């Protein structure tokens, strides 16, 4: 068993959602294997199933001026921000082939980044075992996680703040949590890191944590498989 992995670069949110949905349909039909999409989004705000527009702190006029779109989506969680310098991952995995354990799947997603941050950057990150999903450094979230599961196949996924402009999180109450902050890899290590290097590391740690080999696909190869 292997994981198909494709780095798409910067992709508009709606386009990425279309690609996810296409892969999801093929995964349900067993016509494609487990697939991990890695990408960046232009500035966008998404509202999960438990979310509220009340957690967007700026006006519609401000968002329009800044060319920031807002989408209500089917993932778990509340409000989050995506933008340049943030590595977004969409794992479309069939949980029916394992043990249909959604909590374990989220645990493994968190484990990818906990191990990566410790091994590669010497930073201690942790889960909030009692309350919230995601990966934290102290009281600050560095990886947000929100998934959806339909017919035991996952969609949506994680957002890893690499070189993200953290000021943009002031536009929202991140994940609806007023008493928590956000951080980035850049802030933790005190320097900007080459984004593609982080992509490579995340791919590697996905393989390690999920115990599978990787099938690295170019964008054209993926689109050929999807017939788009």
UniProtKB/Swiss-Prot annotation:
It catalyses: octanoyl-[ACP] + L-lysyl-[protein] = N(6)-octanoyl-L-lysyl-[protein] + holo-[ACP] + H(+). InterPro entries: aa-tRNA-synth_II/BPL/LPL (IPR045864), BPL_LPL_catalytic (IPR004143), Octanoyltransferase (IPR000544), Octanoyltransferase_CS (IPR020605). SUPFAM superfamilies: Class II aaRS and biotin synthetases. Its EC number is 2.3.1.181. It is found in: Cytoplasm. Residues 30-214 form the BPL/LPL catalytic domain. GO terms for molecular function: lipoyl(octanoyl) transferase activity. Pathway: Protein modification; protein lipoylation via endogenous pathway; protein N(6)-(lipoyl)lysine from octanoyl-[acyl-carrier-protein]: step 1/2. Coiled coil: none annotated. The keyword Transferase applies. The keyword GTP-binding does not apply. Substrate binds at residues 75-82, 144-146, 157-159. One of its GO terms (biological process) is protein modification process. In the reaction, the free carboxyl group of octanoic acid is attached via an amide linkage to the epsilon-amino group of a specific lysine residue of lipoyl domains of lipoate-dependent enzymes. Belongs to the LipB family. PANTHER family: LIPOYLTRANSFERASE 2, MITOCHONDRIAL-RELATED, OCTANOYLTRANSFERASE. This is Octanoyltransferase. It comes from Caldicellulosiruptor bescii (strain ATCC BAA-1888 / DSM 6725 / KCTC 15123 / Z-1320).
């Amino acid at each position: 068993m292997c994981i198909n992995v494709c780095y798409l670069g910067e992709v508009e949110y709606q386009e990425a959602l279309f690609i996810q949905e296409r892969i999801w349909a093929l995964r349900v039909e067993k016509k494609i294997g487990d697939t991990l999409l890695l990408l960046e989004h232009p500035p966008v705000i998404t509202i999960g199933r438990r979310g509220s527009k009340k957690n967007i702190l700026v006006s519609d006029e401000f968002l329009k001026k800044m060319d920031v779109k807002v989408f209500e989506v089917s993932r778990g969680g509340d409000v989050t921000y995506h933008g340049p310098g943030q590595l977004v991952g969409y794992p479309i995995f069939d949980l029916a082939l394992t043990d249909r354990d959604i909590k374990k799947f989220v645990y493994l997603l968190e484990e990818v980044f906990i191990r990566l941050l410790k091994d590669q950057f010497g930073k201690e990150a942790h889960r909030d075992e009692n309350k919230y999903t995601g990966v934290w450094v102290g009281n600050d979230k560095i990886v947000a996680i929100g998934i959806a599961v339909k017919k035991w196949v996952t969609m949506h996924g994680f957002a890893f703040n690499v070189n993200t402009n953290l000021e943009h999180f002031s536009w929202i109450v991140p994940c609806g949590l007023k008493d928590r902050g956000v951080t980035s890899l850049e802030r933790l290590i005190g320097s900007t890191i080459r984004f593609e290097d982080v992509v490579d590391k995340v791919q590697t740690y996905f393989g390690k944590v999920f115990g599978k080999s990787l099938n690295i696909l170019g964008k054209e190869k993926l689109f050929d498989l999807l017939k788009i």
